[in-house]
């Protein structure tokens, strides 16, 4: 899956999602469809979720500080939504994947 590499104050951060981190933000109320209508709630959840997989030791204040330094926030948030959706799509799979188990209705 894709990720974002971000350097802040000479430290690299890798932002990405896993099913676990996507689940964490969903349980806290994240809905990607509401990023545009409730940005004050959804964007901090989305950004937090992107950091959790590889940087779970970061406190929310530090995550906010790093996010505040981002250039092109709109494109950045849209890319995070894309990364989140990639993770969600892994639950649906692809029927063409070799080695997938077949199922049938009985």
What are these regions (language model features)?
Residues 1-7, 22-23, 30-33, 37, ...:
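Charged interaction scaffolds used for protein-protein
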Residues 13-15:
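Short, isolated positions in well-ordered beta-strands
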Residues 18:
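Residue-level signal for threonine
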Residues 42-53, 78, 82-85:
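Short, hydrophobic/amphipathic alpha-helical patches that form generic packing surfaces
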């Amino acid at each position: 899956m894709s990720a974002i590499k971000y350097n802040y104050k000479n430290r690299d951060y890798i932002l990405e999602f896993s099913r676990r981190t996507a689940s964490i933000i969903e349980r806290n109320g994240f809905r990607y469809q509401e990023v545009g209508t409730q940005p004050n709630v959804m964007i901090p959840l989305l950004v937090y979720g992107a950091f959790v997989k590889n940087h779970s030791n970061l406190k929310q204040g530090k995550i906010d500080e790093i996010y505040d330094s981002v250039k092109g926030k709109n494109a950045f948030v849209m890319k995070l939504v894309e990364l989140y959706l990639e993770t969600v799509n892994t639950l649906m799979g692809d029927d063409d994947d070799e080695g997938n188990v077949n199922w049938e209705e009985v």
